[in-house]
């Protein structure tokens, strides 16, 4: 059978690098052929972080960063192909998520904005690019997120198996696969790694809390945890999605101001529990029991996984590797899949998940010619 190669490009709210994956969709299940992470240079990272906070001269900075991120994504593709020695002519298309700088679907005129110019990626790689996956769903009245549940349904669903796929990036999202004729559901639960990363970066200048060791050295403060969990987002009904617009460093500092007597490691433990409790609450609303499979960076945080297991005794807990998909690359593979769906003219959103008025083919194609 002829190979069906697609590349997926993903940089999430954590901004911890550009993940690039080469995937073969010629078989029944996606096959990861090669993977590569391109580090985001510090000057570009600072520019992106500034752009995520309202300030002046945003249009000029947006235009420059759009090109810069496109160049970085193209570099990730070219390095990926060099690593696996596959010619660009063998790749049908690149699916590029881009870098989200605003996600505000709940305004009167909702919008989402990802940068990373697909024209630049196509020009510098010589491969057609499919990008801008979220805005069609928003145009149809949806949240534009999460988009991965349709991929999860096709890849992980099994009749008779009640499964939840939990993706923990900067933001955490879940996909509920009921294992019967009931609707697949999915939504953002709230912060994933974004606040625990922000706090350790601020206090210790470390990029992330490796294996949750710093959180494990602290003790959760119940008063602070209760206050954090009182954020209105956690009581919203789905479909719902969120991002740095709600859960960011400014919000965190505001929440911490009455708790400045706490030790720094106790705050880290409490922030980790915010992630775990918000996830567990939403899961228990869907079902008290089932199979839980975790992907994304959070799957590699042992303390996070331990705390989830305690909060969810009715669930078996594994990473998606138990289902044949490497948890580190699952989201990149999903965007390669979204590119394939666009190429084949097939819908890729789930209206029950996003709230869109109908299914739709997502993304636009940017030719390398």
From Swiss-Prot:
One of its GO terms (molecular function) is kinase activity. This is Anhydro-N-acetylmuramic acid kinase. CDD domains: ASKHA_NBD_ANMK. One of its GO terms (biological process) is peptidoglycan turnover. Pathway: Amino-sugar metabolism; 1,6-anhydro-N-acetylmuramate degradation; Cell wall biogenesis; peptidoglycan recycling. The gene is anmK. Its EC number is 2.7.1.170. HAMAP family: AnhMurNAc_kinase (MF_01270). Belongs to the anhydro-N-acetylmuramic acid kinase family.
């Amino acid at each position: 059978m002829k190979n069906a190669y697609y590349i997926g490009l993903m940089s999430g709210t954590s901004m911890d690098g550009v993940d690039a994956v080469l995937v073969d969709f010629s078989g029944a299940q996606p096959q990861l052929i090669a993977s590569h992470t391109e580090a985001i240079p510090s000057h570009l990272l600072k520019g992106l972080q500034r752009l995520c906070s309202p300030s002046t001269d945003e249009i000029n900075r947006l235009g420059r960063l759009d090109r810069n991120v496109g160049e970085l994504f193209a570099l990730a593709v070219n390095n990926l192909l060099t690593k696996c020695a596959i010619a660009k002519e063998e790749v049908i298309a690149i699916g590029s998520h881009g870098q989200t700088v605003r996600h505000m679907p709940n305004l009167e005129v909702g919008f989402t904005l990802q940068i990373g110019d697909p024209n630049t990626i196509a020009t510098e790689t010589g491969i057609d690019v499919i990008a801008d996956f979220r805005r069609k769903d928003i145009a149809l009245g949806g949240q534009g997120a999460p988009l991965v549940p349709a991929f999860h349904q096709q890849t992980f669903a099994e009749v008779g198996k009640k499964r939840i796929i939990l993706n923990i990036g900067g933001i955490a999202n879940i996909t509920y696969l009921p294992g019967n004729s009931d609707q697949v559901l999915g939504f953002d639960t709230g912060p994933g790694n974004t606040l625990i990363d922000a706090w350790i970066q601020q206090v210790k200048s470390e990029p992330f809390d490796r294996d949750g060791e710093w959180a494990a050295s602290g003790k959760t403060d119940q008063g602070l945890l209760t206050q954090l969990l009182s954020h209105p987002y956690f009581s919203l009904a789905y479909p719902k999605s969120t991002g740095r617009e709600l859960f960011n460093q400014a919000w965190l500092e505001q929440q911490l101001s009455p708790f400045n007597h706490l030790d720094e490691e106790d705050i880290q433990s409490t922030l980790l529990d915010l992630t775990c409790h918000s996830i567990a609450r939403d899961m228990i609303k869907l079902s008290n029991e089932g199979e839980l499979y975790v992907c994304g960076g959070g799957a590699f945080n042992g303390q996070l996984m331990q705390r989830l297991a305690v909060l969810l005794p009715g669930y078996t807990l594994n990473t998606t590797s138990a289902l044949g998909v490497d948890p580190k690359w699952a989201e990149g593979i999903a965007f390669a899949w979204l590119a394939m769906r666009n190429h084949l003219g097939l819908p890729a959103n789930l209206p029950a998940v996003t709230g869109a008025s109908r299914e739709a083919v997502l993304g636009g194609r940017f030719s390398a010619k």
